[in-house]
């Protein structure tokens, strides 16, 4: 009975903790879209000449950087909250569980050990969204067995993959912004650019 109560209580904490809030994913999606809109304007800015290009691209790059910073800050806060929740779940040592319950409950104790071991591993990696998504979602499933049948599991896996893609897209878009800025600076410093000043 004690073991059942312990497991149920832990799951009440764990299940809500495992779901990234949609707002974090949406923030990334919005930032990626906005950044894409910014860097799509760069070729036109370059065609207007070095001085216009450097001004427009500086502005667009700064806005893109702000979007990226806001998005990543939001996701970091989400993942840190997740880490805290998971650490709260995993405070019981598996060794204590074995000493207390193994003689009487046997295999069930091993299941609980796997569960808390998975929680501990998740708590260590949760502050890194990419590591969390790529390494631990699938790791938790085999440890808990029935986890992948929970209603939130499919959505969670999809959002993590989506989130990873959005992070990569955001980084790629920001690189394009920086590359375009460097291109504009090079034009401005070229003989042709100096002639237009």
UniProtKB/Swiss-Prot annotation:
Any one GO cellular component localisation term in the record: extracellular region
Keywords: Secreted, Signal
Residues annotated as signal peptide: 1-19
Primary localization: secreted
Subcellular locations according to the entry: Secreted
Protein name, per record: Uncharacterized secreted protein ARB_03673
């Amino acid at each position: 009975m004690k073991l059942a109560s312990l497991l149920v209580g832990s799951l009440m904490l764990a299940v809500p903790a495992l779901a990234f809030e949609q707002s974090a994913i949406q923030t990334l999606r919005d930032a990626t879209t906005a950044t894409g809109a910014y860097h799509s304007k760069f070729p036109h800015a370059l065609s207007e000449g070095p001085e216009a290009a450097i001004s427009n691209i500086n502005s667009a790059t700064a806005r893109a950087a702000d979007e990226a910073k806001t998005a990543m800050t939001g996701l970091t806060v989400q993942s840190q909250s997740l880490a805290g929740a998971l650490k709260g779940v995993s405070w019981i040592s598996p060794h204590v569980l074995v000493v207390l319950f193994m003689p009487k409950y046997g295999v069930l104790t091993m299941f609980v050990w796997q569960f808390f071991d998975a929680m501990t591993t998740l708590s260590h990696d949760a502050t890194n969204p990419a590591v969390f998504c790529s390494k631990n979602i699938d790791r938790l499933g085999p440890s808990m067995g029935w986890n992948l049948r929970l209603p939130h599991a499919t959505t969670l896996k999809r959002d993590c993959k989506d989130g990873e893609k959005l992070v990569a897209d955001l980084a790629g878009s920001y690189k394009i912004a920086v590359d375009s800025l460097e291109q504009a600076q090079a034009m401005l410093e070229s003989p042709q650019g100096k002639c237009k000043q």
